[in-house]
Amino acid sequence: MSGRRVLALYAALLFGFAGVLCRLFYLASRTDYAARAAAQSTVTLELPARRGGFYDCMGLPLTGLEKRWLALCFPGQENYTRLYACTDTAGQELLYRSRSRAAPFLVEVDRDMTALGIPCYGASRRYAAAPLCPQLLGYLDGEGHGAAGLEKALDALLTGSGARDTLLCPVTAQGTLRTGEQVQHLQADSGAVGVRLTLSRSVQRAAEAVAAQTMTTGCILVLDVRTAALRACVSVPGFDPADPAASLEAPDSPFLNRALQAYAVGSVFKPVLAAAALEAGLAPEYDCNGAVVVDGQIFRCAGGVPHGEVDLSAALAKSCNGYFIRLGQQLGAQALLQQAQALGFGRSIGLAEGLIAQSGALPGAEELAQSGQLANFSFGQGSLLATPLQVAAMMNTIANGGVYRAPCLLDCALDETSGEELSAFARPQAERVLTEQTAAALHTMLEQTVVEGTAQDASGLPGGAAGKTAMLFGVPAS
């Protein structure tokens, strides 16, 4: 090769290297390219969306009771063994699958491992292993939105904008954390707030324990006498809100809130007739021989057992059907219907949007014009239907001196960080429907029902008790 050609080749190589160097200098001096390169080596992880929680009347949490953490794992770390011992089966499977993963990931653990060099971020399981009032609170769908109960009714409030915190992880090509750099935690304010309910966590837990020991299906309600605020609402059987699909085929309809469903009423309706009689100044005596005949139809007392000479108090305590049939005839259908409506029968009770106690059914005046139907109505039978919540509200009215309040469940929205009340939910208005004298007389009669009547199983309770029992299709209810 001639000297001229060699010189030309060297010149071409020199120009080529010079071009490459100029291009490298250009790229290095461009901040947007540098940022783009950094972004390509930064992994972004989203933390679960923060959802407002439910709290009881004392501010104690009803959801999020089981604290958990999300541990940030980088490939190649030698702490997989420690993480494996601190997570559940799903977390262990995730760790196993991610052994050769070239990117960081999050796994749920049961303790904060930050002090051990593993970054952890606070989280919680929405529902405890022994969940509280699942039919009231409801559950979430696969996207984390309310699908039933209060979770659905208050979803917008609890969710806010849905904005999530993010983690920016500067990584190497192998997915490990770059030397000398740290993970950035970018916090987002979703505006989600908590909701304080009227429930009492301790009373709810106690009621659920009683239900678990004494019933396979049924419900328990506890109301605050003065305000009619729900302190406990138990419906059995229940379900796991963390895994509602597991109960879809379960017997006895566990998703059903029995406290809000309408059923035949039975003898717990008799205080309504007693109230109407006292308001009308009636307290007749009656000689019960165990049965009464109305238009050729025989209505018997329980077991056909005669109660003998009874007044209003004794008839209520012994649950004498014959007495109340005769009393209903004296009072008439209109007076009975008016009294029942005043005490909340025949009207629904709204606890939240979509969470409504059924209105039940009151027979019409035309139906009660038939003497047999009036007789049935007089001791809680026939077409009469009511929810346990309606019956509880009626009894609460007597305990509250004759003042009716519709039961309520929602108290206020609150800031979960400060505990500050943000806005209060509306409460139903109070309405006097019985005189104080009538309420006091009924209260005494219902105490006697416990002391010497059909409700003696409740006698001896600390502080005393008053109440009424019923028998529905052979199944006792109270």
Segments (PLM) and residue ranges:
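Periplasmic/cell-envelope proteins involved in peptidoglycan metabolism and beta-lactam response
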Residues: M1-A245, L337-A342
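Beta-lactam-recognizing serine transpeptidase/beta-lactamase-like catalytic domain environment
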Residues: P61-T63, D224-S267, A275-S478
